[in-house]
Amino acid sequence: MVKFAVIVFPGTNCDFETVEAIKRAGGEAERVWYKQSVKDYDGVVIPGGFSYADYLRAGAIAARQKVMEEIRELAEEGRPILGICNGFQILTEANLLPGALRPNKIPRFLCKWVHLKVVDVETPFTYLYEEGEVVRMPIAHAEGNYYIDNPSKVRIVFQYSDEKGSITEEANPNGSVLNIAGVTNKQGNVLGMMPHPERASDRFLGSEDGLKVFKSIVEWMKK
C-alpha cells in the first residue's frame, strides 16, 4: 500500500482533510509532525493553512525547518511531493519549485470556487485527467499570485479558466502570471497548487474533481 506523510507545521489546518482524501483515493496517509522524519514514506503532502502564522512571508519559516531537507532528498529520488496552498508557498520558499507567491492583485483574502483547466496530464498528479479537462475546486488565500520570470523553468499543470476552459483575465482570481494555478518542476514529481483538491474530494463538498489528484498519485505509484 502506498503511504504518504502529511506534514503538520504549527498553523497547518488542512491536514485531516488531506489524510481523508488520500484514503478515499486508495492510499494510506499519516499526519506527521514537522520534527519527525519522513524518510520511510512513499510520498509527502504539505497541506494548506497558515504555518507559523505567515510571519515574514507565507511559508518562509516552515521552508527553513529540518524536515524540508529530507523532503528535498525525497524529491531528488523522484518521490512525489505535493504542496497545496500554503504548501505551495513553502515549496517555493524552499526552492523546491521556482517562482514566488505574491499578494493577490486585489490585496485581500480570497475564498471561493474556481474553474481550472488541466493542461499537462503527463505527471503523477494528473495522469487520470484528460488534457483540457475543466475541473472545479476552491481557493482560500491572500498570497496566491504566482510569479516566475521564465515560465519555461516549470511545467504548467493547472490554469485558472472559465467553465468552458477559456484562459481569460476575468477567470484569473489573483493575478498569477499566465493564469497559473499549479506547476511542477521539470521532472514532474513536485507539484505546487493554490486550489485545494482535498476540499473537492467528496460530492457532499460540492465537487469530487480534486479527488483525481490523489487517485492519480496512488495509481501512478502502483505502476
UniProtKB/Swiss-Prot annotation:
The keyword ATP-binding applies. Keywords: ATP-binding, Cytoplasm, Glutamine amidotransferase, Hydrolase, Ligase, Nucleotide-binding, Purine biosynthesis. One of its GO terms (biological process) is 'de novo' IMP biosynthetic process. It is found in: Cytoplasm. Pathway: Purine metabolism; IMP biosynthesis via de novo pathway; 5-amino-1-(5-phospho-D-ribosyl)imidazole from N(2)-formyl-N(1)-(5-phospho-D-ribosyl)glycinamide: step 1/2. Its EC number is 6.3.5.3, 3.5.1.2. This is Phosphoribosylformylglycinamidine synthase subunit PurQ. InterPro entries: Class_I_gatase-like, PRibForGlyAmidine_synth_PurQ. HAMAP family: PurQ (MF_00421). GO terms for molecular function: ATP binding; glutaminase activity; phosphoribosylformylglycinamidine synthase activity. It comes from Pyrococcus horikoshii (strain ATCC 700860 / DSM 12428 / JCM 9974 / NBRC 100139 / OT-3). Pfam families: GATase_5. NCBIfam families: FGAM_synth_I, PRK03619.1. Part of the phosphoribosylformylglycinamidine synthase complex involved in the purines biosynthetic pathway. Catalyzes the ATP-dependent conversion of formylglycinamide ribonucleotide (FGAR) and glutamine to yield formylglycinamidine ribonucleotide (FGAM) and glutamate. The FGAM synthase complex is composed of three subunits. PurQ produces an ammonia molecule by converting glutamine to glutamate. PurL transfers the ammonia molecule to FGAR to form FGAM in an ATP-dependent manner. The gene is purQ. The active site is at 85 (nucleophile), 196, 198. It catalyses: N(2)-formyl-N(1)-(5-phospho-beta-D-ribosyl)glycinamide + L-glutamine + ATP + H2O = 2-formamido-N(1)-(5-O-phospho-beta-D-ribosyl)acetamidine + L-glutamate + ADP + phosphate + H(+); L-glutamine + H2O = L-glutamate + NH4(+). Part of the FGAM synthase complex composed of 1 PurL, 1 PurQ and 2 PurS subunits. GO terms for cellular component: cytoplasm. Residues 4-223 form the Glutamine amidotransferase type-1 domain.
